[in-house]
Design a protein with these regions (language model features):
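Active-site clefts of carbohydrate-active enzymes
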Residues: 203-221, 254-256
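Catalytic alpha-helical scaffold of carbohydrate-active enzymes acting on polysaccharides/glycoconjugates
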Residues: 1-204, 228-251, 259-310
Length: 310
């Protein structure tokens, strides 16, 4: 029995706060995309793993975070360019919409402030603080964290995840994005299915199969004008492959990728195809936590979570 996972990196402005020149269109699209994706998931009753930046769950802060061991200047944009942009720094309204959705989504972590765990400047102290603060805020919302999505897929400090009671993380995709990925998957007929596995820390690595917005710009416009949306075709192919096998197809995106209506159409086409295949076959839709329980069993995550709070 094959399965499909969809994970989202829910970050608003935090996904770009460390960049010298953040992409304005995507920064401004975060709230819109969040709401559109929730509506589409509810329409097709498809659960997903939403990895949320913990800072979004705050109502207010001083913009300094003096007790947080981040590198110098890490929170500067909060006090400068975005000092008057609460809509980019906070999102308790959006998180409430997520948690109150009729669809059974998984609430997961994307760190507290979009820290890049694989970078040299992210030392163990910083990584621990990012996880601890995220868990504390989640607990204030009566939520727990089973899954973690590394900001920018920059993997590091996996031992910290295990110590903090996390059971699963999204691993890197074995396939490539963009034109090269389309070539590999179509011309070379390379499988997009992935195999989750327990790593040396007892965490379940749930690798990504496909970034749903890896083929954009002029190339996308040309492709759509003479053929169709290549990413929709690839996603359908991956879903169909999972339907025929016992494999896992794992798609991911950011809400801020939905900058225009054509992006909404892409997601509607993919989700409607997934819903049809799920209805007609024994294909299942899972969250990352579901996969972790299936692969490692429910006891391992419970034991880690208990140990981390003791």
């Amino acid at each position: 029995m094959g399965s499909v996972v969809i994970s989202l990196d829910a970050e608003l402005g935090w996904g770009f706060h460390d960049l010298a020149d953040p992409p304005t269109e995507r920064v401004e699209a975060g709230r819109r995309g969040w709401s559109v994706m929730l509506e589409l998931f509810e329409e097709f009753d498809i659960p997903a793993t939403w990895a949320v930046v913990g800072h979004l769950m705050l109502d207010d802060c001083d913009g300094v975070h003096a007790d947080h061991p981040a590198p110098d200047g890490w929170f500067d944009r909060e006090r400068t360019d975005w000092a008057d942009r609460d809509d980019l720094r906070y999102g308790p309204d959006l998180v409430t919409d997520l948690l109150e959705s009729d669809t059974d989504h998984e609430f997961a972590s994307h760190s507290f402030s979009h820290a890049l765990f694989g970078r040299p400047e992210t030392d163990r102290e910083f990584a621990v603080a990012e996880l601890e603060r995220s868990r504390e805020i989640a607990a204030d919302w009566n939520e727990s964290i089973d899954s973690f999505v590394y900001p920018r897929n920059d993997i590091g400090h996996r031992e910290v995840l295990a110590e903090q009671g996390v059971s699963a993380y999204r691993g890197r995709s074995p396939t490539r994005d963009g034109v090269r990925g389309i070539f590999d998957s179509t011309v070379r007929d390379r499988s997009m299915l992935v195999e989750p596995a327990v790593d040396e820390y007892g965490l379940v690595n749930v690798p990504a199969s496909m970034f749903l917005f890896g083929f954009e710009g002029p190339a996308r416009t040309v492709a759509e004008s003479i053929w169709t949306d290549p990413m929709v075709e690839l996603a359908r192919s991956g879903i169909d492959e999972a339907t025929r096998t016992d494999g896992l197809f794992h798609m991911w995106l950011h809400p801020n990728n939905l900058t225009h209506e054509r992006d909404d159409h892409r997601m509607r086409a993919i989700l409607s195809h997934l819903e049809r295949r799920r209805t007609a076959t024994d294909l299942t839709v899972e969250t990352m936590a579901d996969v972790a329980r299936r692969v490692a069993g429910p006891s391992s995550a419970t034991e880690r979570a208990t140990a981390s709070w003791s």
